[in-house]
Amino acid sequence: MCGILAILNSLEEASKLRKKALSLSSRLRHRGPDWNGIYQSSDSILTHERLAIVGLENGAQPLLNEDETIALTVNGEIYNHEKLREDLVATGKHTFKTHSDCEPILHLYEDKGDDFVHMLDGDFAFVVYNKKANSFLAARDPIGVVPLYIGWHKDGSIWFSSEMKAIKDDCYKFQPFPPGHYFSSKTKEFVRYYKPNWIMGDSPSGVLKSEEQVLPAIKEAFEQAVVSRMMSDVPYGVLLSGGLDSSLVASIVSRHAEQRVEDHEKSRAWWPRIHSFCIGLKDAPDLKAARDVADYLQTVHHEYHFTVQEGIDALPDVIKHLETYDVTTIRASTPMYFLSRKIKAMGVKMVLSGEGSDEIFGGYLYFHNAPDANEFHVECCRRIKALHSFDCLRANKSTAAWGVEVRVPFLDQRFLDVAMNIDPSHKVCHDDQGKKRMEKYILRKAFETKEGEKPYLPSSVLWRQKEQFSDGVGYSWIDGLKENAENEVSDEEFAKRESYFPDDTPTTKEAFLYRKMFEAIYPGKECMETVQRWIPTWGASQDPSGRAQKVHLSTTE
C-alpha cells in the first residue's frame, strides 16, 4: 500500500502550499517508505508515498500522461491492468511510460472522462487531475479495501488523503470517502459506480440455487481471485491463523507458487516456497492450528508471540494508526500490528489474508441466531457494506503502519458476484430439515475433494469452528484488556461518561479507555463521526467477542 494526498483548487500561495503538502504527506510515509513524489500546478498538488510492489524500477508516482497535462496519484493494485493496457494500446492513441499496474487509469480517463471506474478490477483509491481543464476525479474501490478520506477547506479547496491524520488539522469538514463511488469536480457529488443488485438492497438473483451449481462456482471464482492477487515483483507471504479462511488462501497460493502468475505460469517463480505468518499469546488456539496447516502445505512458517502487557503498551500507537476507537477492531488489530512489524523485518512487503469471508457467508457465530434466510442475507449485505470501517480498516492500517500491503481475495468483485447471488438457504446455519450445521457450510463444502484428489486442507481444518481473530490469538488477550480497563478507568470516571462523551457514549470501561486514547490524538466531533462501532445484530451486544455467543460456549464446554 501507498499513501496519497491531494489538495485541489487551493487559494494558498504556491510555495506555501508545496511546503504544507510535503509536511502533511510525511504523516503518511509509514504507508510508503520506498520513495515519495509530488506534482504541482498553479493551485493544486498531488503527493505520493510509495510502497513498491509492481513495476519497481519505473513505477514512481504521481504518474503523468504523454503531454504531462494529466497527473495521477494512486494507492492500490489494478489486477486486470494487462488487459486494460492491451486494449488501450490497440487504439493507437496511447504510449505507456511505465510498467505500473496503475498507469491504465490515466489513459482510461483521457478516453472516457469520469465514466470508467467500473472497468477497474482491483483495490484502489486514486485522484486524477487534469491541468488543462482544471478538473479532477477521485474514486475508491467497490468495498473499501483501500482507505480514502475527503475534506473541505475554508478556502473552497477539496482535499483527499489515505488517512485522516493528514487532513484533520486543516479541513473544517472531513469524512471517509464512500466505497464504490467516485467524486468529480464537474458535479461535486458522489456517484455510485458499483451497483450489483445485492448492494442496492435487492434480494439475491437466485441464479445459483442447487448445490451442484453453487459448489463449483464458488471454488472456481475464489481460486481465480487468489491467483490474481499473487501478482508481485517482491517477496510475499500469507497470514495464516489456522482458521478456514486464511487456510484456504494459503492452500491455493501454495498450489500456484512454483510458477510466476505474472506471465501466466510460463516461468518458474523466484520465491517458490510460500512463507506463512502467525501470531498469538503462547498456547493460543490459532498457533497450533496454523502450525498444522503450515505442515500440511509445507510452507516456511513463522510463529511469533506477544504478551498481554506488550499489547496494552501498544494501544496508543495502534489507535493512532487505525484512527478508530471501536473495541472489536482494536482488539483484533493489535496482534496484526505486531505481526506486520515482524513481517517487514523479514523483507516481505505483501501478504494475502482472509478478510471478508465472514461477512459474505455469515461466518460470525451470532449468525446462528438469524431468524430466517432472508434476514441472514440482509445482515450479510449490511456487514459487507460496513467492511471499510472494520475489517478492511484493520487489515489495511495495521499492515500499512509498517509498510506492508495486504490483499484480500474474498472481496474480489467476480467472487462477490458469485457468492452474493447464491440462494441464502445455502448459507444459513441449518439445513432444509432444520438440523444445525456449521457456519460457512457452503464454502467448506465447495473445497471438499473427491477420493483420489489431493485435499485442499485436512478435514480437521476445513471443518474447524470460527474463532474471531482477537479470540484465536489467545483467550486471555481479551480478558487482559478488560482487566486493564478496569484498572485504568475508575468507577467515578465511568459514571460521568455521558458528560465526557455525550455523542456515541461508551458502554463499557474498555470502550471508554479507547475513546479517551482516540480523543487525545483525534479530538473533536468531526473525527468522532468518522468511526463506526461493530455490534452483533443478534446475541450478546455488550461484548462483541465470539466467546460471548452461546454457540461458541456450547462447542467448547
UniProtKB/Swiss-Prot annotation:
ATP binds at residues 239, 279, 353-354. Pathway: Amino-acid biosynthesis; L-asparagine biosynthesis; L-asparagine from L-aspartate (L-Gln route): step 1/1. Residues 217-466 form the Asparagine synthetase domain. Residues 538-557 are annotated as: Disordered. The active site is at 2 (for gatase activity). Gene3D superfamilies: Glutamine Phosphoribosylpyrophosphate, subunit 1, domain 1 (3.60.20.10), HUPs (3.40.50.620). Keywords: Amino-acid biosynthesis, Asparagine biosynthesis, ATP-binding, Glutamine amidotransferase, Ligase, Nucleotide-binding. It catalyses: L-aspartate + L-glutamine + ATP + H2O = L-asparagine + L-glutamate + AMP + diphosphate + H(+). GO terms for biological process: asparagine biosynthetic process; L-asparagine biosynthetic process. This is Probable asparagine synthetase [glutamine-hydrolyzing]. NCBIfam families: asn_synth_AEB, PRK09431.1. L-glutamine binds at residues 50-54, 75-77, 101. Its EC number is 6.3.5.4. The keyword Ligase applies. GO terms for molecular function: asparagine synthase (glutamine-hydrolyzing) activity; ATP binding. The record marks 355 as: Important for beta-aspartyl-AMP intermediate formation. GO terms for cellular component: cytosol; phagocytic vesicle. Residues 2-188 form the Glutamine amidotransferase type-2 domain. It comes from the Eukaryota. It is an enzyme of class 6 (ligase). Disulfide bonds: none annotated. PANTHER family: ASPARAGINE SYNTHETASE (PTHR11772), ASPARAGINE SYNTHETASE [GLUTAMINE-HYDROLYZING] (PTHR11772:SF2). It comes from Dictyostelium discoideum (Social amoeba).
